[in-house]
Amino acid sequence: MHPKNSYLLINDYVNGLYSNVRVTEIRMCYANSLRLNREDMKKKILNVFAVALVAMAAVVNTGCSNESSLVTDGQPGNAGGDSTLVSFNFALQGFAAEKTVGTRALAAGTDGRVIASSVADAGNGLEVMTEVVEDAKPQTRAGEVLKPAPAQNYTILAYQDGVKKAEWVGRFDGTNFTVNADHSKVQAMKPGMYKFYVFSDHLKYQNGKITFGLANGSINALSNIVDVEIHDQKETQTVSFQLGSPYARVRMRINGFSSQAFEGSINGALKYKANTIEGTCEIDPAHGTVTYSKATQDGSLSYNHFTNNIEGDNENISNGTQAIRTSHIITPEDAGCYLLSGTHLNQLSFQFSSDASGTIYRKPVRNRELPLENLADAELETGKSYTITQTIYYKADYLFDDYKTVGSLVPNMKKGLNPVALVVDKDRHICMGLEDVPHVKDGRQWADNLNLKNIETENQDVNGLINTINRYDGWKQTWDMYTTDTSAGYIPKKRTKARNSHFPAFNALENYKGKTQMWYVPGAGEWHSALKYLGIADPTRGFTFDNQEHLEWGDVLGYRLLEVLFYQAGGYPLNDWYWAADDWKTDGKAKAVTVTARSTYAHFGGARKTDGTQVRPFVNY
């Protein structure tokens, strides 16, 4: 950051920044070429011009190589014996276009370089992971024609040895530059080296100084500096201005999980405190200096608008089914905020506006703040575009892949841990796996023979369901050999269901995720805890032998809560019918307890043990 009242020599700054950027010249000559005096003097061309006036950053003008003259020879003009005709080219360099940004790993798919990241508690049951991406520069191919600079007013100044030699003020219409009537179209200039300044009228030229600040930022605020040798020649010379922003552009992208994380109108602003960020810049062409000064009052830079909710791609999740896991909103190309070189993003915060009526996960965003102060000390540079990507997580506890750590996603993923299960009952330390056991054709049977049974069992009615729930015996039924009935003589030796292939649903967990005696088929008790956690107020309501009431998902989010909780952890929600570890005494123990969980309802039930369906594994910590 450049401290207040510190000065940088323009040429030093020009030669230091952007020395590797390559651009392509576009010719757009305008009428009324200007007649210049000349004398017998020639010099080498400096071969550098700046993309951004405020930083005086140099960009080498080239199509195929790193060196190319900024002055090009044209057709013979009508110059007199002591003058040379010149014309100007105007082209737009612009910023990089926004690319798709992943949400599971925040930088995945990002076209750019992550320069800072942080995590924070956003309040109201939400967490945020922030990454700042320096967007990739547009790639310019040899011979490619750049788009014209926007039609607007521009000023061109020519300085030599700190003295202004010429000034033109006029309007560029996309093809031609027309000088205003009150400015001479012909000014005397001797051949030699000149520093040309060109800038849109977002920048002001007064009392020999060029000034601009936070209030002047715009996608159309453009400038350039070109060091040029005016030759002693009869042919027209063309001075090329490839215009870039004198600001750093900062856009916002907010990611969420599920296909509809965002609803309603959402907008906001970057806020700052007095004396924390650069507020104005003053260029002194006569002395070759640049001075930055801090903003002296608290302020904010509002984004014009965000897009509405944008759905992510359809992704394969399980059993050949697809789902949309993510969604996002973003400030479009023309809706960024423009900050000065040297600004540090950790001196800013993002606040949703007071008139924002929208929601994230159906939580109101009005006046809420997403902090940036934990970001690494990242300094913005002139002419570059940045995207602040903030991914919003619904706060919940998960078990991580060390099988010890329990906590919310954001701080633990920042440590390099990966979630393996969602905590659904903290008192009993019960966790539900993030996905089903890998699918097999026709599903997995509870048992491949109806004579295979548990020792302890209940009738298939509401009282029997409640008694079965109260046992919380999923792990025991899976791993304790003494829970399996051997009276029929079918399993005299391998009574542990997880180790017996005659119990396919249990056997699938024998070495699940490389762990033994950890993962298990949940009993009715574990399922009861999970359904209550996920929004079913009373999972036993309406249960009978003949019918089961379809119980709607509660919570303000409904089934979307399941989508958010599982998608944000890299899994997927329940959407099938599943085995429980318990069986029913009714019908000669031929049926086992089941849970049906669809996008609109859930309930307990029962099915023949030889039917095939899904297994959602559970684990305790």
Feature map (PLM): residue ranges:
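Bacterial Sec-dependent N-terminal signal peptides
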Residues: M1-P76, P617
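C-terminal, surface-exposed recognition/capping segments
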Residues: G525-Y621
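GGW-centered surface loops in extracellular recognition modules
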Residues: L380-V440
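Sec-type signal peptide cleavage vicinity
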Residues: N37-N47, V60-F400, L417-P419, N449-S487
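Residues that flank catalytic or metal-binding motifs in active/ligand-binding sites
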Residues: Q152, P246-A248, K426-R428, Q517, ...
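A motif-centric signal for short, conserved binding hotspots located
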Residues: T331-L340, E510, G535, F545-E552
